[in-house]
Amino acid sequence: MAKKNGTSWFTAVKKILWSPSKDSDKKTHHHKETDIKRKEKKGWIFRKTKLETTNSVLQHTVRTVEAEEKEKPPVIVSSVEEGVTEIVKLTATPGFIRRHWAAIIIQTAFRGYLSRRALRALKGIVKLQALVRGNNVRNQAKLTLRCIKALVRVQDQVLNHHQQQRSRVLLSPPSRNYNIEARRNSMFAESNGFWDTKTYLQDIRSRRSLSRDMNRCNNEFYSEETELILQKKLEIAIKREKAQALALSNQIRSRSSRNQSAGDDRELLERTQWLDRWMATKQWDDTITNSTNVRDPIKTLEAVTTHHHQRSYPATPPSCRASRSVMVRSASPRIPCSPSSMQPNYMSATESAKAKARTQSTPRRRPMTAKKRLCYAEEESLRSPSFKSCLWGDHESDYSCCYGDGFAGKISPCSTTELRWLK
């Protein structure tokens, strides 16, 4: 009790002996330590502090520095002391330690967040790659299955073909018949004398004969197919040649018909042109007129023309043909029909009748082409009484024209427009 309440004599002696400066230094240091402890208790600390370790490290560094100071010169010692004091100041403060641990915690949390985000992105990429690769793998699997099916079908067809060939060979006549199973047994039989020279040679010969027979069967089968194909090709070629021949014959016929029609048109045009020239050069005589006055109401005028039977036109102009005989006869037997007979004046036609005959004989015409003239040859020949007869053909002809009037006009020279080719 005395120790706690009152001061002992030992403490009093210490106070007397010790200096006040040392006591003040100790007190200040003690106050600092107590302040640090209070602050540590009030603050929030997530993890345990390592003050003891830091203090031990600092003590160790101080000891090493002191040992080195003894060995080094004074200049180096002063610089080292300054560095050590700075390090001690930085590390000794409790705020620096807290900040250091807080930065570490923040960095760990942020790095964890980044790593999780990267992991999620990688998982999404992996899933997409798996989907794409899965589709590609499925497509490849489908293609491989199709190829395998096609190969299996081909193999089945080949096997069926070989079986059919073998059946044909077996059903062939006995000269070609051979025992396949016996030869196979001889090929694969295990006997002691198989490797003898005679048996070995016989086996080789049998194999050669079998291969020859199989080749013959194959060649016969393919030869039949080739013959059928060649026959079909020949039939197609014959049909094509027939069609070409028919087309050529039709073309030749159409061309010949066109040439004939063009030739006829040309001949007609040449004839009309030649007549125009000849009519222009010919000097007609209007004096050759024979007027008759007959008591009968009906009179006939017959113009008889005679020509040589020739198919070609003469090279010289037909001036000789102009001297054809034109005879006027009356139907009554009273009047003699002689070219030299003279008629009295009272029987001659009057001028009014002549003018009327002229208007009837030469109607007003429009210019027409040779083709239209030929088309309307018969109608216009009946209408125009002026041109009674004309023949430039190959044979003789006689034309007669009937008049209801009681006079006969004079025959005027015809023009090419009044010419009608009668066939």
UniProtKB/Swiss-Prot annotation:
Belongs to the IQD family. Pfam families: DUF4005 (PF13178), IQ (PF00612). Binds to multiple calmodulin (CaM) in the presence of Ca(2+) and CaM-like proteins. The keyword Repeat applies. It comes from Arabidopsis thaliana (Mouse-ear cress). Keywords: Calmodulin-binding, Cell membrane, Coiled coil, Cytoplasm, Cytoskeleton, Membrane, Repeat. May be involved in cooperative interactions with calmodulins or calmodulin-like proteins. Recruits calmodulin proteins to microtubules, thus being a potential scaffold in cellular signaling and trafficking. Regulates cell shape and elongation in aerial organs (i.e. cotyledons, leaves, and hypocotyls) probably by regulating cortical microtubules (MT) arrays orientation. May associate with nucleic acids and regulate gene expression at the transcriptional or post-transcriptional level. Disruption phenotype: No visible phenotype. This is Protein IQ-DOMAIN 16. Signal peptide: none annotated. GO terms for molecular function: calmodulin binding. GO terms for cellular component: cytoplasm; cytoskeleton; plasma membrane. SMART domains: IQ. Its main location: cytoplasm. The keyword S-adenosyl-L-methionine does not apply. Residues 231-251 form a coiled coil. Residues 99-127, 128-150 form the IQ domain.
